[in-house]
Amino acid sequence: MDEQALLGLNPNADSDFRQRALAYFEQLKISPDAWQVCAEALAQRTYSDDHVKFFCFQVLEHQVKYKYSELTTVQQQLIRETLISWLQAQMLNPQPEKTFIRNKAAQVFALLFVTEYLTKWPKFFFDILSVVDLNPRGVDLYLRILMAIDSELVDRDVVHTSEEARRNTLIKDTMREQCIPNLVESWYQILQNYQFTNSEVTCQCLEVVGAYVSWIDLSLIANDRFINMLLGHMSIEVLREEACDCLFEVVNKGMDPVDKMKLVESLCQVLQSAGFFSIDQEEDVDFLARFSKLVNGMGQSLIVSWSKLIKNGDIKNAQEALQAIETKVALMLQLLIHEDDDISSNIIGFCYDYLHILKQLTVLSDQQKANVEAIMLAVMKKLTYDEEYNFENEGEDEAMFVEYRKQLKLLLDRLAQVSPELLLASVRRVFSSTLQNWQTTRFMEVEVAIRLLYMLAEALPVSHGAHFSGDVSKASALQDMMRTLVTSGVSSYQHTSVTLEFFETVVRYEKFFTVEPQHIPCVLMAFLDHRGLRHSSAKVRSRTAYLFSRFVKSLNKQMNPFIEDILNRIQDLLELSPPENGHQSLLSSDDQLFIYETAGVLIVNSEYPAERKQALMRNLLTPLMEKFKILLEKLMLAQDEERQASLADCLNHAVGFASRTSKAFSNKQTVKQCGCSEVYLDCLQTFLPALSCPLQKDILRSGVRTFLHRMIICLEEEVLPFIPSASEHMLKDCEAKDLQEFIPLINQITAKFKIQVSPFLQQMFMPLLHAIFEVLLRPAEENDQSAALEKQMLRRSYFAFLQTVTGSGMSEVIANQGAENVERVLVTVIQGAVEYPDPIAQKTCFIILSKLVELWGGKDGPVGFADFVYKHIVPACFLAPLKQTFDLADAQTVLALSECAVTLKTIHLKRGPECVQYLQQEYLPSLQVAPEIIQEFCQALQQPDAKVFKNYLKVFFQRAKP
């Protein structure tokens, strides 16, 4: 072997050596017999370096995985012998190999097993067992090989081809017949021999049993001999976690409901008499987390049995199953309420399913009602934050608690389905007693009390948030709690979690303020002062900005008396903060978007006359326009690139803020009706010069483009005079991405204004196409994926543009471009349909083609178009689906084929018998299609039902492809 190259395998080797080692690995993979050197090195134990041994196994692995069928029988025998002699050597080694080498060896054994077991090596396991016997080194490797085989055969995370899946099923069937009983016996012997002397091997063996039990005959494991041993392991500290997991897999195995019930009950009796149900005596939380998972598995198994028995009408056994479930509830509750969240989380599935049973029962017993209440109290307690939760810097632990809370919320929702009255009463009790003394109560208890009120909104659902009408007792309970929330002063609590929960809840129950509007002023003040938008925590300020906009939007009819006051109070929050002023704004620019939107909503939805609305909107937007002009001048003069970028950002924010105010308008309150057209036209005139700024083009163009999109909706035809010059600037110095983002703007204008913009479209059609073609024809690096993707997206945008033009009744825009240009455009559409393996673009191209055939394909169409149909469009309908890249198993491709069928149908519709004749006598014979198939094709094409032809076409191409 190349000793110099092998030096590069050491993790501390320099990059040159590492490169050489990689190159050597590639060389050995390609060479037909170099792997034999590695096999010999392993069998002879030539190298002591761990990384070289690992390398040799990697080379063998590649050989078995990808080249095995190319090897001669002798070479295949050599690989088998190499592995067995390596295994024999492990029995005698003074030191065991490193874990990573043992794992890699096990993988190679497993690969060889799945390749050879059914054909050349049926005695695989017997050969291995005869080598390892009960030698601890050998047993360790045997168990690792079994786990590697399990992951090859059963692991759902590994994606298998259908051929591999069939092979794996056959292997498992054969193993069940030929060797599983022997393997199970070997596991029993290993467990018995090593349970007190080698915990590592015993735990490995328990893991193997747990993995295999899912697909072998359960009676081999679920018998007195085996189960008693597993239960014995539950009392040995170093084994009990693994034993717990193994029992969980046994319990989880699908089986007859009555047998499952008996198995679970017998397990429970032994565990209970051994003292495992006394949770409070146990201090090892890691074990309890596994035990909780086991109890969850047993509980859910009993519930599955109950469901099956009910479904089968076996009432007697169903009753027994329910009884068995009920006797586990006390244990479930102990685990649910445990202070360790992992232990609690592991039992939630059982708890949830138990509540689902209760929901189905017509009458609950007193004990069941007590259970529901106990679960409810447990959920309320467990929802509470602990002292360690870090609100300022949330890490992994905090994220896990947030996930755990989501699980508890599902339990709460399920509780509401079982007993809504009880839930409401329990929450009300906790809420009222906590809010009464909030000043002296710990933050986590105040937060959870408000949180519970918040959660009721989803737990007790109503349509359109109408919590305060309908059911009187429920409405009045919620109303009482909301009144307490807004009048208790709890919004002043000095903890971010309480503050945020207050605002979240106020917004969740905004309908309360239509019933009791007298509370609106105090809540508005909370939003606007140090409790909300001016809070010391940026997180609270940010969330409040969003919630404030929701609050104002949903209560816009109630806002009239407060509009001017609110606008005055948020004045400083609306300031565009230029990069050079140095002071940190209270709100980020994203948060300011919500404040601008809120201001827009207040003005537009006010009861003021149009002149007042216009004045207020001008007051809102004029400072932005003035700042914009100053900043644009500064940008033109800025030398430093970092400063240019921050100025461009600021300009972009200004445009974004103005855009956002326009979201307040609607069909009922248009810009015109509110008298605000002039203000937005002024904005347009202020912002458009940014398009001719040579610096920071991307960000400036993006902002102005978005603003234009909004103005097309809001100002309608008043925006049209600005479009030509804006388009001209945006088409200068274009990249693929610029064009791709510019085209939707033109599509929007075309679709909205149609004939009104025909002159503009005619004028800019070819300049736009030239810009697109120029970018598409630019050479790119062969393996530059991002450039290829950008071109693909631009191509799609180009076809989408043509689709919009043809679909908006504007085909004359294309027709008027001169014969040469028209042909060039049509050829690009044909190429799009046939050449590029992009089904989304292909679908669009066929839509364009069928539209053009519909418009121009008749007797009075443009000169030469009928020829084009037969020379190019008809062939495209066959050449595209016949390509290897046209995958009929892909959903997008099927949609493209569907449009291809529409195109052919449209040609037939416009050209009649002439089209059928052309297909019958010229085109299809040229493709060597058999006469009877041609006949069949033409008959399907002439069917009046388009769907018939679509279905036929798919079958036609499935048959035609090799």
From Swiss-Prot:
Post-translational modification N-acetylmethionine, affected residues: 1
One Gene Ontology term, aspect cellular component: cytosol
GO molecular function, one term: tRNA binding
Family per record: Belongs to the exportin family.
Subunit structure: Found in a complex with XPOT, Ran and tRNA. Probably found in a complex with nucleoporins. Interacts with Ran and tRNA in a GTP-dependent manner.
Cited function: Mediates the nuclear export of aminoacylated tRNAs. In the nucleus binds to tRNA and to the GTPase Ran in its active GTP-bound form. Docking of this trimeric complex to the nuclear pore complex (NPC) is mediated through binding to nucleoporins. Upon transit of a nuclear export complex into the cytoplasm, disassembling of the complex and hydrolysis of Ran-GTP to Ran-GDP (induced by RANBP1 and RANGAP1, respectively) cause release of the tRNA from the export receptor. XPOT then return to the nuclear compartment and mediate another round of transport.
Protein name: Exportin-T
